Design a protein with these regions (language model features):
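Short acidic/glycine-rich beta-turn/loop cap or linker motifs at sensory/regulatory domain boundaries
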Residues: 1-10
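PAS-family sensory domains
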Residues: 3, 68-75, 88
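Short coil/loop residues immediately preceding or within conserved phosphate-binding loops
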Residues: 8, 15, 63-65
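PAS and related sensory helical modules
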Residues: 11, 18-39, 46-50
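Terminal output helix/cap of sensory domains in signal transduction proteins
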Residues: 38-67
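PAS and PAS-like sensory/regulatory domains
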Residues: 64-66, 73-82, 96
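Short loop/turn elements at sensory-signaling interfaces that couple input to output
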Residues: 82-98, 102-108
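Sensory-domain boundary/capping and coupling elements
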Residues: 107-119
Length: 119
């Protein structure tokens, strides 16, 4: 999506994001989000999540990490971890490439490893 605080237009989504959001195709994703990345984030978390992302980037990092509840096309929410990387694209200018991971899946597949990290 565009790395612009005022215009976070979604430019591309892979099949995994379509699956996580419950969308059949890119057009459906763009329609329910209004083409905006922030509209994937639960409304009461949007401001704090955006502030966190930009604070990390403005602090000199090219990667950002955040946790939020992602709104699916059916109106339900899932807990996700977001790992974004800001880059300069020849065709689209400054953009974020983002990997969004379902927290429950991570816990199910890596639970033991995650517990070891905490010790």
């Amino acid at each position: 999506y565009r790395a612009d605080k005022e215009n976070d237009e979604i430019l591309l989504a892979n099949n995994e994001l379509l699956r996580l959001t419950g969308c059949k195709n890119m057009d459906e994703l763009l329609a329910y989000t209004g083409k905006s990345f922030r509209n994937l984030i639960r409304r009461d978390e949007q401001e704090s999540c955006q502030k966190s992302i930009w604070s990390q980037i403005d602090g000199g990092n090219v990667n950002d990490y955040s946790f939020f509840h992602m709104r699916k096309a059916d109106g339900t929410y899932i807990s996700v971890l977001d790992h974004g990387r800001i880059v300069d694209s020849v065709h689209n200018g400054r953009v974020f490439y983002v990997m969004i991971m379902d927290l429950k899946s991570l816990q199910r597949h890596y639970g033991d490893c995650l517990e070891l990290v905490e010790k």
